[in-house]
Curated annotation (Swiss-Prot):
Belongs to the bradykinin-related peptide family. Is hydrolyzed by angiotensin-converting enzyme (ACE) by only 7.5% (compared to bradykinin). The keyword Secreted applies. This is Fulvonin. It is found in: Secreted. GO terms for cellular component: extracellular region. The keyword Secreted applies. GO terms for molecular function: toxin activity.
Length: 11
């Protein structure tokens, strides 16, 4: 999963 700019981890 990739964390977008310190937000919730999205895949």
């Amino acid at each position: 999963s990739i964390v977008l700019r310190g937000k919730a981890p999205f895949r």
